[in-house]
């Protein structure tokens, strides 16, 4: 008879896993395999883990070792104060984008009827974060991917955010004839030939949400050109971009007629969001 595999505790499983992957990756994968939270791990880390769950964890570790993003393996990612479902149809929300949310909130009055758009919403991260902090605002989240929009709708429902409407379409197409107080977007902004697209987590994320032409600015140009027709006088456009694109994006906004154009840095002190205010009553 062959010997049964040794029963291991959660702590032992983690110690073995960190030989292959980072502990910061191993821990959420273990909790996902166990269906537990961090408080349980702290209290029960020495408890034996059933073989089936240990095997599931081992398979997740192997997939992470091969490069799959933790967020896709667990199906979720924390953003702002929200736990969001994600899939391979959506970009993985990142902490850098919280800079855009903070800047948007600073520019939204605490009054009923404020209208906000999140272009290319993906998982809904930007729209839902704003909606959670400004329940009196009306949010519209657009995306060209029906699969991504289904994830955004799921997340809105899961968090009880009923002030968010999801619309299918490319950038501003679903907004014909409407004007808003603020439009925000984290569009694709990586150059199509950038080697980083073939490295790390980016290999697994949807290319349509990452790359945008030879200089990474094709989609930003489209948004800047078309947004004024959808802004109220004094309305704001906020765009996330790459660390080295601040000057170029600011120049596009200024050339289009935006005022109060400024570039803001993320938590790593890198240029990350450029914004401008539309001063006119018509686009």
Swiss-Prot record:
InterPro entries: DNA_methylase_N6_adenine_CS (IPR002052), HemK-like (IPR004556), N5-glutamine_MTase (IPR050320), PrmC_N (IPR040758), RF_methyltr_PrmC (IPR019874), SAM-dependent_MTases_sf (IPR029063), Small_mtfrase_dom (IPR007848)
A Pfam family the protein falls into: PrmC_N
Annotated positions binding S-adenosyl-L-methionine: 120-124, 143, 171, 186
Group of enzyme by EC: transferase
Keywords for this protein: Methyltransferase, S-adenosyl-L-methionine, Transferase
GO MF annotations, alphabetized: nucleic acid binding; protein-(glutamine-N5) methyltransferase activity; protein-glutamine N-methyltransferase activity
Source organism, top-level taxon: Bacteria
Methyltransferase among keywords: yes
A GO BP entry: methylation
Catalyzed chemical reaction(s): L-glutaminyl-[peptide chain release factor] + S-adenosyl-L-methionine = N(5)-methyl-L-glutaminyl-[peptide chain release factor] + S-adenosyl-L-homocysteine + H(+)
Assigned EC number: 2.1.1.297
Annotated binding of substrate, by residue: 186-189
Entry annotated with the keyword S-adenosyl-L-methionine: yes
HAMAP family: RF_methyltr_PrmC (MF_02126)
PANTHER family cross-referenced by the UniProt entry: HEMK METHYLTRANSFERASE, MTRF1L RELEASE FACTOR GLUTAMINE METHYLTRANSFERASE
Entry's family note: Belongs to the protein N5-glutamine methyltransferase family. PrmC subfamily.
Function: Methylates the class 1 translation termination release factors RF1/PrfA and RF2/PrfB on the glutamine residue of the universally conserved GGQ motif.
Designated name of the protein: Release factor glutamine methyltransferase
């Amino acid at each position: 008879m062959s010997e049964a595999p040794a029963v291991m505790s959660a702590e032992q499983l983690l110690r073995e896993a960190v030989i292959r992957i980072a502990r910061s990756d191993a821990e959420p994968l273990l909790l996902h395999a166990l269906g537990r939270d961090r408080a349980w791990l702290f209290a029960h880390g020495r408890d034996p883990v059933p073989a089936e769950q240990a095997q599931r964890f081992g398979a997740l570790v192997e997939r992470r070792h091969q490069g799959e993003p933790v967020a896709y393996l667990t199906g979720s990612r924390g953003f702002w104060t929200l736990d969001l479902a994600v899939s391979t149809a959506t970009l993985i929300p990142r902490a850098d984008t919280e800079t855009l949310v903070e800047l948007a909130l600073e520019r939204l009055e605490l009054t009923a009827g404020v209208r906000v758009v999140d272009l290319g919403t993906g998982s809904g991260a930007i729209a839902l974060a704003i909606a959670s902090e400004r329940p009196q605002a009306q949010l519209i989240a657009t995306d060209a991917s029906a699969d991504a929009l289904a994830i955004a709708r799921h997340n809105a429902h899961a968090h009880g955010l009923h002030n968010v409407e999801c619309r299918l379409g490319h950038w501003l197409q679903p907004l014909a004839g409407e004007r808003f107080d603020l439009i925000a977007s984290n569009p694709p902004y990586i150059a199509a030939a950038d080697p980083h697209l073939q490295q790390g987590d980016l290999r697994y994320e949807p290319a349509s949400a990452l790359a945008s032409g030879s200089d990474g600015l094709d989609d930003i140009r489209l948004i800047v050109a078309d947004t004024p027709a959808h802004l109220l006088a004094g309305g704001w456009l906020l765009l996330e971009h790459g660390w080295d694109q601040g000057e170029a994006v600011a120049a596009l906004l200024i050339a289009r007629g935006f005022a109060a154009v400024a570039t803001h840095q993320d938590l790593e002190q890198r240029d990350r969001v450029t914004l401008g205010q539309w001063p006119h009553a018509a686009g």
